[in-house]
Amino acid sequence: MDAGYLGVGAMGQPMAHKLLDAGHGLTIYDINEAAMQPLLERQARRAVSPRDLADRCEIVFVSLPTLAAFREVAFGADGLAQGTAMKLLINTCTVGVPFVREIERAMAERGVSVVDCPISGGPPGARAGTLSVMVSGDPAAVERVRPMISLWGRTLTVAGDKPGAAQVLKLTNNILSAVALAATAEAFVMGAKGGLDPEVMLAAINAGSGRNSATEDKFPRAVLTRSFDYGAEMHILMKDIDLAVAQGEELGVPMWVCEAARLVFKHAMHKGAANEDLTAIVKHVERDSGFEMPKTR
């Protein structure tokens, strides 16, 4: 099955590669020429605008980092909404429930179905094909793209058929991921400054009740190596935390712990960390603690 792919950056490019690996034809578009090149070398075709992509392809995937970017490619000049061939739009972005509902209504007026399909696992999971894929939308549309989106991960969870249901599911995941990273950063700096070997801490925590996505993946991969290259920038995580807090407020759910994690990352952002890797939050905790953990890997 041929498809279009808009946004082939840190997440979109490896996900597009998985579609090519499975024999699907792809037409791609990205404002970054260098991001498209590896896919073009594998015989993907180039679109010249979002509208051109939607003029050529019945199925279009979108992987973009921000709501503003998605809004522009959807509704801006030469946007997807102006295309004539697109019938199914698959949103893999974390953009929050209100925007998903907005784009679902706008596209429905044009005869286009929207499948909400946010993913979790970061660039490493996208490259390995081990993402957690969350999906919601019209059951027939979901089933049509299931063989394609299943290529990205080891699990596919259907959150329901309501617009935005998968966004809510993704935000629950991101709350836990962000809180775990902030808490793990503080815990490890405290322990190391108190004289503990970070590797000893890691082994004990991962064998006990404190293990989490930071201790099992982010710290071994990008913190204890001092590489801080997990592959996702801090401003993207902050955007997701903001969406989660807003969702909680809309539903009348107190988000005190999430708010505390937001303060940790907001403090780092005010120190210029917006474009740093999200694991670099450890360096900001270290700076405020007057202590730097040793490289152990």
Q: What positions do the PLM features span?
A:
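Rossmann-fold dinucleotide-binding core
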Residues: T94-N174, A178
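Rossmann-fold NAD(P) dinucleotide-binding segment
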Residues: P50-V114
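Active-site-proximal catalytic alpha-helix in oxidoreductases
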Residues: A128-G129, V133-S136, T157, P163-G194, ...
